[in-house]
């Protein structure tokens, strides 16, 4: 394979045996594609599909006035350019959004016209562009910047619209009878439920309201009793014979039934005796006897149901749905021959598989007409309102048959039709979709029929947790729904005003108020449950957050109501949702992560890729299947053995079919997994040897990787999985080349690339400039910084990584550090998962992290006057002001400690009334110190660091202070310098290209050159750019290209002028601050944190612990070569946790390090390049796994590769396709180590050998964002609760340590009376006692004088509130 610029610098040895069938898809596509589909900003208005904003506008417009005389039509929408870019929005605390304008057409019609829809009826047309508010834009990395913070909209997994059949599992009724139900769930609108009760009557509910008999709904649809019976039942004709009634012999209806009477042939032979079951043999006998009818006794007809009215001489003898009894049969037999009833029909029902449920329900129904049914429904939906037939009809129609109120959606219609076995053809036609989005009478009847079929034992209920019944609602769809809500509010207001549009001569601008739309959008992005503050700890946490799928949120589940089933792993999760990565705690199973290869289809269902298998042969065709499409397929595992021509070689292949793991012959296999890692998510896919870890620990491992803090120097994992590169690339933290070329210029903050000729656009200078992000604060206060990994003159290609971001090393994710560890107990310092650390780790800054804090000082208008930011602060010494400038703001670079002033601020304070003399003195001497108080911004307690940046924002109209002007000037100078440099680079590039074009060309004149002169590069060296552009070559094509370059440079100059003017306008203009705010100063503090006891660390296998002690290097255990161990872990942490992956990682890490040391030795001894190639070939190509084509690398490449492998050869052991034990041992041997991976260690303090050999190796350890500095604090005195007067709790409130009732019991048990008294009084809520104690300490008297605790007063007040008087009496 061809390696990219960064990949060939350090090749990861892969142990994968299986070929790569498809690359991992772009990891953020679920976010980016969804929002792109919503906005469609890059498509021309006419080419836009009916989705997202387009669909929202189309569904609301046209809006017609009540009279029909005016109409508002939607033409198109377009998005402007955002006022500030992403970086400026974060600094200013504003939203990254673009203004949206909509072209609206107002049509006024002639009031007197008969046909309002004809062209002749149109009186006036007014078209106008209307501002519809700001629409937040998504950044390239799938995030939104809302009020200056990066947020992510998490996708929601909700129940798909459609029809669902279920039962109550026998829990509803005391008898334990299983009651079936059906539910029609629309995308938008009223829910319709049908359910059985214990008596087998069918009921309906609308929107979970009071129950109605299902027959009421059927009658409301306009069906009569006989029509309902015809729809739901088969009929049996009953003929009146000479002696007995007879029925037709229908074999299928008799099979399996118990004979209620003797069935006799015409000859008198008994074929079936009474009480015997009628089987297939007896039916055959009846048919052979030539019988078409069976004689039945009268008793057989008792309790049977009439299928239709019996009418004799226009008189109704019996109504349809009447139960036949003896009386009715006598009445029927009594008629004379002329008027006799020769036949009538009954319903075919039985107790086995043909229940009379609908007939029984009809009999219980008191309504007899459509009108009565509608009024019944109205009473349930609008209790207390007087019903009329018109309003009832209108309500029922609007609930299920009106597209404005009810939307089953395209997905809902597809699910509905599929479930009921009806045809569904997907279409983009908006009119057909709208037509299909409402229910029809047939739909409701079909649902009831299916429910009754299930109750009759035919058909199955649905599995609600099947991923075919749950779909993903991504950011675009949720934004569209919210936008539509806003538009509906606008529609209501517009309809009111439209009627007066003509008389008041209104324009579309006057009619439409965009505030409801803007408010709806703002609410969704700002405060929706699914709009979350982005987890920006490291690149992995960003990617995982964007790929998260939540079952919570609006329209979803709640934590309290969600049961075990919905949280559990379902077999349809395979390849779609990760079975490992989910939070521990109340959200377990409700918040999931997408599997590595999963994507959503057009209906919102999750799909996973499979290779097509035809006749036992695996093809290269890749099919994405949703959980619905997967039903009935037979899927082989990715590691199933395959021959060279692609045939499955095993006689019986291990497959998945209908959610079960079974073995089948190759001919039956239809699909095959694309990769063993398609089951897991990105985070779980980063755990090496995951297959050897217990699932619970793997869950912790994948969650804790997201909490790793980016270290000062990123260090790639020696033992990885090969997924690291994909995460780093797709997370967006690295700088990736947009086009190939040569690195022209590079410094710490910028990379300049001269683009390849082939990738250039005609006429451009062919330069790409990449500006790097330097020392920026993330959402979690970690440091975002990009470092270049290319050098001047390097050749790069499209997609190469030019700069590493936080936690990336040469384009690979690097969350922690490779640390030399030993598994052994050490003096109890690694008891209970504690971690013993060597001082060497601290010295080398291995786990040193930089945290950036943003501290804000706001100067407001108060009632007493304006707050002022100044260096003139009352009662503050010179030393405290030493780091401030004349404007009262700290210098950049100042090192500050807890309590130091960062921004000086004074606030006016209300004073007592001054005497006239004092007023006079104040007027003369201008003494202000007395009327202001110090409210300066200080460094918080337990913090210290370096000021790395200051930003000053001043309200528009308020004069800027000296510091604000200085910042503005430096930013403008820096920007001007950048632009000048940019232009210089472009001009130089243009010079180079002109030189190449003119070299060897004949000229016809220009620039003082004679016609016919042949140009040479040497002659052009000293010519200015203007001179070069004046040259007129003979060849026309060259002349045209010169003209293009000249035009491009002119455009570039104009572009740079415009950019500078725009930047200057933005910087010099005042800032749009909140009401009452005059000035905001933001100070950024960089805090360097070394690892220390109390910090939490973890490996990738859920092996977490807290640093217990940092030992001197000389006391740590060491091996026979004198190499000390960096970390000592407790071996007892492994067996019970069953995460053996960490031991295998340790061994493989040791081999990787040993091989690196061997390479280092070869480089130091200046071994021949041939020997180096041979050794690398042994590592990469002779231990198994993926082969590396070292011959394709030049000698320089090999040297660069070897240089990068000195610290260890990185290994890639992919999930479920990783290194085998034998391969690990072979590598240990190749590195010159024992195959068992153990070493003899010596005690650093005594020099004595430990009794047994110890497992020593390299493990990748992470420092988690649970730092002791953020958690630990101490309180002397501080704030108290207002009511109880007890100290507050928590670091944020500077609170105290709680002394609870159990601790009180402990003191009681010890009889420590004085300590107990102190705890319950002066150290808690005895207000007077603690004041006296303070006085005593000041006076030097060491005694305590306790009083009455305030909580006792609270108790007495509570008792008094119950009406019981309680008084305290002092007795001496």
Swiss-Prot record:
InterPro entries: DNA-dir_RNA_pol_bsu_ext_1_sf (IPR042107), DNA-dir_RNA_pol_bsu_external_1 (IPR019462), DNA-dir_RNA_pol_su2 (IPR015712), DNA-dir_RNAP_su2_dom (IPR007120), DNA-dir_RNAP_su2_hyb_sf (IPR037033), RNA_pol_bsu_bac (IPR010243), RNA_pol_bsu_CS (IPR007121), RNA_pol_bsu_protrusion (IPR007644). It catalyses: RNA(n) + a ribonucleoside 5'-triphosphate = RNA(n+1) + diphosphate. Its EC number is 2.7.7.6. GO terms for biological process: DNA-templated transcription. GO terms for molecular function: DNA binding; DNA-directed RNA polymerase activity; ribonucleoside binding. It comes from the Bacteria. Pfam families: RNA_pol_Rpb2_1 (PF04563), RNA_pol_Rpb2_2 (PF04561), RNA_pol_Rpb2_3 (PF04565), RNA_pol_Rpb2_45 (PF10385), RNA_pol_Rpb2_6 (PF00562), RNA_pol_Rpb2_7 (PF04560). PROSITE patterns: RNA_POL_BETA. Keywords: DNA-directed RNA polymerase, Nucleotidyltransferase, Transcription, Transferase. The keyword Signal does not apply. One of its GO terms (cellular component) is DNA-directed RNA polymerase complex. NCBIfam families: PRK00405.1, rpoB. DNA-dependent RNA polymerase catalyzes the transcription of DNA into RNA using the four ribonucleoside triphosphates as substrates. The RNAP catalytic core consists of 2 alpha, 1 beta, 1 beta' and 1 omega subunit. When a sigma factor is associated with the core the holoenzyme is formed, which can initiate transcription. Belongs to the RNA polymerase beta chain family. HAMAP family: RNApol_bact_RpoB. This is DNA-directed RNA polymerase subunit beta. It comes from Psychrobacter arcticus (strain DSM 17307 / VKM B-2377 / 273-4). The gene is rpoB.
């Amino acid at each position: 394979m061809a390696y990219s610029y960064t990949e060939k610098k350090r090749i990861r040895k892969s142990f994968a045996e299986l070929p790569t069938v498809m690359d991992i898809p772009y990891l953020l596509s679920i976010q980016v594609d969804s929002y792109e589909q919503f906005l469609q900003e890059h498509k021309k208005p006419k080419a836009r599909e009916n989705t997202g904003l387009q669909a929202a506008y189309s569904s609301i417009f046209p809006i017609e006035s009540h009279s029909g005389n005016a109409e508002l039509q939607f033409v198109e929408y377009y998005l402007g350019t955002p006022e500030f870019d992403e970086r400026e929005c974060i600094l200013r605390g504003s939203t990254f959004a673009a203004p949206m304008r909509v072209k609206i057409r107002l049509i006024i019609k002639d009031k007197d016209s008969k046909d309002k829809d004809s062209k002749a009826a149109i009186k006036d047309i007014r078209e106008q562009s209307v501002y519809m508010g700001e629409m937040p834009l998504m950044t390239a990395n799938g995030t939104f910047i809302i009020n200056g913070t990066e947020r992510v909209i998490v996708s929601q997994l909700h129940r798909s619209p459609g029809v669902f059949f279920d039962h109550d599992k026998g829990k509803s009724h005391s008898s334990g009878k299983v009651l079936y139900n059906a539910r029609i769930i629309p995308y938008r609108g009223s829910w319709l439920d049908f359910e059985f009760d214990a008596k087998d009557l069918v009921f309906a509910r609308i929107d979970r309201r009071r129950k109605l008999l299902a027959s009421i709904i059927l009658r409301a649809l306009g069906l009569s009793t006989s029509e309902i019976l015809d729809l739901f039942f088969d009929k049996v004709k009953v003929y009146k014979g000479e002696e007995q009634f007879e029925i037709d012999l229908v074999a299928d209806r008799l099979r399996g039934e118990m004979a209620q009477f003797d069935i006799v042939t015409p000859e008198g032979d008994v074929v079936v005796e009474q009480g015997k079951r009628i089987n297939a043999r007896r039916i055959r006998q009846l048919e052979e006897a030539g019988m078409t009818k069976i004689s039945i006794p009268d008793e057989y007809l008792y309790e049977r149901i009439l299928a239709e009215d019996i009418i004799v001489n226009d008189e109704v003898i019996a109504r349809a749905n009447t139960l036949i009894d003896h009386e009715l049969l006598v009445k029927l037999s009594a008629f004379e021959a002329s008027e006799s009833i020769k036949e009538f029909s009954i319903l075919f029902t039985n107790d086995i598989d043909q229940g009379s449920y609908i007939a029984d329900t009809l009999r219980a129904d008191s309504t007899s007409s459509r009108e009565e049914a509608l009024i019944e429904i109205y009473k349930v939906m609008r209790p207390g309102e007087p019903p009329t037939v018109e309003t009832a009809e209108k309500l029922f129609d609007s609930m299920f048959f009106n597209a404005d109120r009810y939307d089953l959606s395209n997905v809902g219609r597809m699910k509905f039709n599929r479930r009921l076995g009806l045809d569904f053809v997907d279409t983009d036609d908006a009119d057909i979709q709208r037509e299909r989005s409402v229910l029809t009478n047939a739909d409701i009847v079909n649902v009831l029929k299916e429910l009754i079929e299930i109750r009759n034992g035919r058909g199955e209920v649905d599995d609600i947790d099947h991923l075919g019944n749950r779909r993903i609602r991504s950011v675009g769809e949720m934004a569209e729904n919210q936008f539509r809500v806003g538009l509906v509010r606008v529609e209501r207001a517009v309809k009111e005003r439209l009627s007066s549009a003509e008389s008041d001569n209104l324009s579309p601008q006057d009619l439409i108020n965009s505030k409801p739309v803007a408010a709806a959008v703002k609410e969704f992005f700002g405060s929706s449950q699914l709009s979350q503050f982005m987890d920006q700890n490291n690149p992995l946490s960003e990617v995982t957050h964007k790929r998260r799928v939540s079952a919570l949120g609006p329209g979803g589940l709640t934590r309290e109501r969600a049961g075990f089933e919905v949280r559990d792993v379902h077999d349809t999760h395979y390849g779609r949702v990760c079975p490992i990565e989910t939070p521990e705690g109340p959200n377990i199973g409700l918040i999931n992560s997408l599997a590595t290869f999963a994507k959503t289809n057009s209906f919102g269902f999750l799909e996973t890729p499979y290779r097509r298998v035809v006749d036992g042969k695996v093809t290269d065709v890749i099919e994405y299947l949703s959980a619905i499409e997967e039903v009935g397929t037979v899927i082989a595992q990715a590691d199933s053995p395959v021959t060279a021509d692609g045939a499955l070689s095993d006689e019986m292949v291990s497959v998945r079919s209908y959610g079960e793991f079974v073995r089948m012959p190759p001919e039956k296999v239809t699909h095959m997994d694309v990769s063993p890692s398609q089951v897991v998510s990105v985070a779980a896919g980063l755990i090496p040897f995951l297959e050897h870890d217990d699932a619970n620990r793997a869950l912790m491992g994948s969650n804790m990787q997201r909490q790793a803090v980016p270290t000062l120097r990123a260090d790639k994992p020696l033992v990885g999985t090969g997924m690291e590169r994909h995460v780093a690339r797709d997370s967006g933290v690295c700088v990736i080349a947009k086009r190939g070329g040569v690195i022209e210029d590079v410094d710490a903050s910028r990379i300049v690339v001269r683009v390849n000729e082939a990738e250039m656009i005609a006429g451009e200078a062919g330069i790409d400039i990449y500006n790097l992000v330097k020392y920026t604060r993330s959402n979690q206060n970690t440091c975002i910084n990009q470092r270049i990994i290319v050098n001047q003159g390097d050749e790069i290609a499209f997609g190469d990584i030019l700069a590493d971001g936080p936690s990336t090393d040469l384009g690979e994710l690097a969350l922690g550090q490779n640390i030399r560890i030993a598994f052994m107990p050490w003096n109890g310092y690694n008891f209970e998962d504690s971690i013993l650390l060597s001082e060497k780790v601290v010295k080398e800054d291995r786990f040193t992290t930089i945290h950036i804090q943003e501290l804000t000082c706001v100067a407001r208008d108060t009632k007493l006057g304006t707050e002022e930011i100044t260096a003139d602060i009352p009662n503050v010494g010179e030393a405290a002001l030493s780091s401030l400038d004349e404007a009262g703001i700290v210098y950049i670079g100042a090192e500050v400690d807890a309590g130091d002033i960062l921004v000086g601020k004074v606030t006016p304070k209300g004073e007592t009334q001054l005497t006239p003399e004092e007023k006079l003195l104040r007027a003369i001497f201008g003494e202000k110190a007395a009327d202001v108080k110090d409210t300066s911004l200080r460094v918080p307690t337990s913090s210290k660091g370096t000021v790395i940046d200051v930003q000053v924002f001043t309200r528009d109209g308020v004069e800027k202070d000296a510091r604000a002007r200085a910042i503005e000037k430096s930013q403008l100078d820096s920007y001007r310098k950048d632009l000048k440099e940019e232009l210089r680079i472009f001009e130089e590039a243009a010079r180079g290209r002109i030189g190449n074009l003119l070299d060897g060309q004949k000229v016809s004149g220009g620039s003082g050159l004679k016609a016919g002169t042949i140009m040479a590069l040497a002659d052009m060296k000293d010519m200015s750019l203007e001179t070069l552009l004046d040259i007129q070559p003979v060849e026309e094509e060259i002349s045209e290209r010169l003209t293009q370059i000249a035009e491009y440079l002119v455009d570039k100059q104009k572009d740079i002028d415009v950019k500078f003017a725009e930047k200057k306008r933005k910087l010099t203009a005042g800032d749009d601050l909140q009401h009452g705010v005059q000035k905001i100063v933001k100070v950024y503090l960089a805090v360097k944190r070394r690892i220390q006891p109390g910090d939490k660390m973890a490996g990738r296998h859920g092996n977490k612990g807290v640093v217990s002690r940092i030992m001197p290097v000389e006391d740590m255990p060491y091996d026979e070569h004198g190499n000390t161990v960096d970390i000592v872990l407790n071996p007892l942490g492994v067996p019970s946790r069953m995460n053996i992956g960490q031991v295998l990682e340790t061994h493989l890490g040791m081999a990787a390090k040993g091989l690196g040391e061997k390479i280092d030795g070869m480089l130091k001894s200046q071994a021949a390049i041939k020997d180096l190639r041979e050794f690398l070939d042994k590592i990469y190509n002779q231990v198994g796994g993926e082969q590396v084509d070292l011959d394709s690398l030049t000698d320089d490449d090999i040297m660069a590769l070897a240089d990068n492998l000195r610290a260890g050869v990185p290994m890639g052991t992919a999930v479920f396709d990783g290194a085998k034990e034998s391969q690990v041992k072979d590598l240990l041997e190749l590195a010159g180590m024992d195959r068992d991976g153990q070493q003899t260690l010596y005690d650093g303090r005594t020099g004595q050998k430990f009794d047994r050999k110890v497992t020593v190796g390299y493990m990748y350890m992470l420092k988690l964002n649970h730092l002791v500095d953020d958690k630990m604090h101490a309180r002397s005195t501080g704030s108290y609760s207002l009511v109880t007067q007890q100290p507050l709790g928590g670091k944020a409130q500077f609170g105290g340590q709680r002394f609870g009732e159990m601790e009180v019991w402990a003191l009681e048990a010890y009889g420590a009376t004085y300590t107990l008294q102190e705890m319950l009084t002066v150290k808690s809520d005895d207000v007077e006692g603690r004041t006296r104690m303070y006085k005593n300490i000041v006076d030097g008297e060491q005694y305590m004088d306790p009083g009455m605790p305030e909580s006792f007063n609270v108790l007495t007040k509570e008792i008094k509130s119950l009406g019981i008087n309680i008084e305290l009496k002092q007795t001496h």
